Amino acid sequence: NCFATPYLQQPLKHGADIVVNSSSKYINGSSNAISGILTDSGKFKWDKNRYPGFADYVKYGPMAFVAKLRNSLFRNMGACLAPVNAYLNSIGLETLGLRMERECSNALDLASWIENNYPDIKVNYPGLCSSKWHEIAKKQLTNGYGAILTIRVGSKEKAFKFINSLTIPYTLSNIGDTKTLAIHPFPTLRT
């Protein structure tokens, strides 16, 4: 989960067994470390017959998944966070609540302003009552509706004209840091 962060959404409370979060985005907050977080509820039943790859780990009970990850990823592939990246993430984590509160508030204000002042532009933001995702977002998100909103202006050409007319946002593809971004998804996601 890149967009909601653990501050806004706690999937374990909604029945998820394992949660994957990118800590390179909002948790870090400065785009200066690449990392992720795996959270295991410990509730999944790792039956060794159904999941033969876990046969050696079922003895660890609720820690079976973590034990396998530690053995497979850490030992065999070296997937260990560098100490400096852990430090940089911890600095960002200290201000996550405040940053998400402000960014969610700004996103809602901007989405509302666009929706109220530009009826020809379609705004997608789960915090808007007009959003088809609003009711789901109210149930699943706490402390805000996220800092990402999308708009539809009608065509790729109009989108680039709109983006190029902006003066404050950067045209970058890394979300979740200290910069306000305006990007078009097609060229960004297909490069």
What is each of the regions a protein language model found here?
Residues N1-Y118:
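Conserved PLP-enzyme active-site core in the AAT-like
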Residues M100, P119-T191:
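Conserved C-terminal alpha-helix-loop-beta "cap" of PLP-dependent enzymes
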